[in-house]
Every structure is written in C-alpha cells, then in structure tokens.
C-alpha cells in the first residue's frame, strides 16, 4: 500500500498542473488551534486562480486529453468550482469548453465561467439533470466529458 502511495505522490509532483496553479502554502490556523487545543493547519487552495482546489484535477485531466488525443473541446456538468476549473483550464490550453449547470446555480458562478469564455448551458433543476444533459451532448457530438469527481485523473 505504501509503495502505491509513494508512486501516486511522485505522479502528483510530476503533474503539469503547476503550469497554472501555485504550490499553495499550508498555514497555522491560530484561532482554530486555540479553540481545539491542537495545531490545526489549512491548505490555502483559496489562493488558486479559481479560489478552489478543483482547478488541479480539471487541468490535469484536460491537459492529458489535449496531449494524448489532441482534443479541442471538452464538456462538463457542475454548479460551481469544478465548472470554473474546467473553464479556466480550457482557456489556458486554448480549447473550447461547454459547461452544463443547473438553472439553480448561483449567478456569480455562472458569470465567472462566462468570463473565461466557456459556453454555459443552464438546464435542469439539479446537478443530476445537468449531468444527464451533458452526457447526452457528449454522446451526440463525440466530445470528452470531464467528470467532476468520478475520475482518477480529476481527483
């Protein structure tokens, strides 16, 4: 088990995500540490360009697809941080992205994705309905789907 973990850490360290993300610091959370009488540290992924760790997985997956399969258009479904990660990654790699988001997605998330020049399709009342529409769109147009969580290259 440890050997596999070490291989995985090496794979992460060699990842090309550092083309677009920072090596975010780990900082002591003083008030939390005092409250819980223990040292509590925070990994500052809020300092990433999209203010979330989700950009790491999105960029890793898309960069691998561009490199291996020369894709020029990707699709995802998300109501938030993954959508922003895919949009940012697509823009950085100069490819198209279509993002399916539930109609209930906060407007600030929709606007952030649009700012990155991705096409946004608001559909359905929840994530599952947006996901279903995205998968149908991928099948019809023969495009790769970037799953927000069910893909080892995204985790």
Kindly give the residue locations of the regions a language model identified:
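PLP-dependent amino-acid enzyme catalytic core
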Residues: 1-155
């Amino acid at each position: 088990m440890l050997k596999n973990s070490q291989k995985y850490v090496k794979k992460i360290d060699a990842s090309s995500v550092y083309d677009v993300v920072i090596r975010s610091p780990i900082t002591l959370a003083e008030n939390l540490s005092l409250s819980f009488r223990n040292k509590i540290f925070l990994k500052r992924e809020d300092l990433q360009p999209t203010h979330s760790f989700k950009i790491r997985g999105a960029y890793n997956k898309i960069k691998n697809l561009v490199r291996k399969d020369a894709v020029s258009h990707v699709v995802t479904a998300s109501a938030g941080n993954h959508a922003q990660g895919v949009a940012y990654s697509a823009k950085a790699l100069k490819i198209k992205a279509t993002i399916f988001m539930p109609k209930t997605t906060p407007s600030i998330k929709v606007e952030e994705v649009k700012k990155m020049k991705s096409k946004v399709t608001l559909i359905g009342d929840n994530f599952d309905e947006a996901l279903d529409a995205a998968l149908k769109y991928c099948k019809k147009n023969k495009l790769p789907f970037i799953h927000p969580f069910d893909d080892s290259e995204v985790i």
